[in-house]
Structure formats: structure tokens, C-alpha cells
Amino acid sequence: MAVKKGDLVRLVEEKFVGSVEAQASDPRLPPYVFAGQGEVVDLMGEYAQVKFPVPTPNVWLRIDQLEAVK
């Protein structure tokens, strides 16, 4: 999936579970990460910085683990 700044995305749970990123993080991610609409605010290599519409810090996620939200 080609993403660009401003795109709305969500994290695909099946692609995230078992990944290196999941192993390095708290396994109990909040539901809004998988069901919500995060906005891509920056890109660096194979990662996208995503801002979710809740009062939490932005998070870096692998682009291949993201899915566009319509």
C-alpha cells in the first residue's frame, strides 16, 4: 500500500501480531489503533508516523501493517 501524508489508516491486527514491533511493545494495544482512523503525519523509510484522534502521542508503524480507511 502506498501511503502519503494526510491519508487515513488503521493498523491491521493480523499483520501486527507476531511482528518485531509487536514484540517490542505492550501487547495490549487499545482498540482505536485497529478500528480507528489515524492520520499519516510523516513518512520515513518503511515507517509512517500516525496520529490518532485521541489525546495520545503519535506512533510510528510499519507501512505494510497499515490499511487505508474509507
From Swiss-Prot:
Leader sequence segment = none
Its Gene Ontology molecular function terms? oxidoreductase activity, acting on NAD(P)H, quinone or similar compound as acceptor; quinone binding
Organism, by scientific name, is Cyanothece sp. (strain PCC 7425 / ATCC 29141)
Give TM regions: none
Q: How does it assemble?
A: NDH-1 can be composed of about 15 different subunits; different subcomplexes with different compositions have been identified which probably have different functions.
Locations listed in the record: Cellular thylakoid membrane
Which Pfam families does the protein's record reference? NdhO
**Top-level taxon of origin:** Bacteria
UniProt family annotation: Belongs to the complex I NdhO subunit family.
Which keywords has UniProt assigned to this entry?
A: Membrane, NAD, NADP, Plastoquinone, Quinone, Thylakoid, Translocase, Transport
Q: What does this protein do?
A: NDH-1 shuttles electrons from an unknown electron donor, via FMN and iron-sulfur (Fe-S) centers, to quinones in the respiratory and/or the photosynthetic chain. The immediate electron acceptor for the enzyme in this species is believed to be plastoquinone. Couples the redox reaction to proton translocation, and thus conserves the redox energy in a proton gradient. Cyanobacterial NDH-1 also plays a role in inorganic carbon-concentration.
- GO CC annotation, single: plasma membrane-derived thylakoid membrane
**Sorted alphabetically, which InterPro entries does this protein's record hold?**
NdhO
Enzyme Commission number(s) of this protein: 7.1.1.-
Spell out the reaction equation it catalyses.
a plastoquinone + NADH + (n+1) H(+)(in) = a plastoquinol + NAD(+) + n H(+)(out); a plastoquinone + NADPH + (n+1) H(+)(in) = a plastoquinol + NADP(+) + n H(+)(out)
Membrane protein topology class:
Peripheral membrane protein
- The protein here is known as NAD(P)H-quinone oxidoreductase subunit O
Query: What enzyme category does the UniProt record give?
Result: translocase
- Presence of the UniProt keyword Protein biosynthesis in the record: no
